[in-house]
Amino acid sequence: MSPCVCWLQLTLALLLTLAAPGRGGGNCPATCLCPDPHTVDCSARGLTRLPEGIPLDVRRLLLSDNWIPRIPADFLVLYSDLVYLDLRNNTLSRVEAGTLSTASRLVFLDLGSNNLTEIAQGTFGESRSLIKLRLGNNPYLSAVDEDAFLGLTSLRELELERNALSTLHVGALSQLPSLRLVRLEGNPWVCNCNFASLFAWLMDNRQKLPNDIKQPIRGQGTPARLLIGLPSSGAPDVDSEWAAAPPHRRHLTPKD
């Protein structure tokens, strides 16, 4: 075998090794796995910031179970091919306005189990491709702006369960034309005018509630688990088991 052919075979073997999935070579960040050319899995790596070396053409980015406190405002501008982003169970306290834009291709975004405190107007930048948004299990999330989801015309599933919401303006939901599923259970709702409007909207749109929340209370035809957190005086005929929200898991910060 000629030296030229031998060298060619060696070079080809080396290239195939570097391109193999999950080895951290090529365009894959050193601390992550890349099971296919457009997926980067950096879950549970103890990361305190976004890893370096994420390929620009990544489409599926898994960053769950780390300690990441923030996402740069231009992150999704840089990674414009991204369609699936999982950031659940980190230490995010806010999402910068403009992180998503009308040009974003993101379809799935999971920000559950973080330390978010509010969802402000413009947070999601009228991203018209977003279909599923998970914001549940943020124990400090107590405020959602009426126009927080404005422009999310393709959003079908919205999860806001087990947060610290005592009120939610009905406009936050009513201006989502494609909404098919909304989760609100496990919040400490206060029975006031805002809640009455929200509850009336949910009664008119009960097909958008999860199946396990559509059960009536004592024949009143109201979704039982949605009332978790209401004081019994504000919700007559509600059993005491629904009078308090289940405890939230406290999201700890890494030790020094």
Predicted regions, residues:
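LRR N-terminal entry segment and analogous cap-like coil->beta motifs
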Residues: 35-84, 88-91
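The feature encodes a structural signal of leucine-rich repeats
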Residues: 47-52, 71-74, 96-98, 120-122, ...
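Consensus "Asn ladder" position of solenoid repeat domains
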Residues: 45, 66, 90, 114, ...
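Leucine-rich repeat
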Residues: 48, 54-57, 69, 77-81, 92-93, 101-105, 117, 125-130, ...
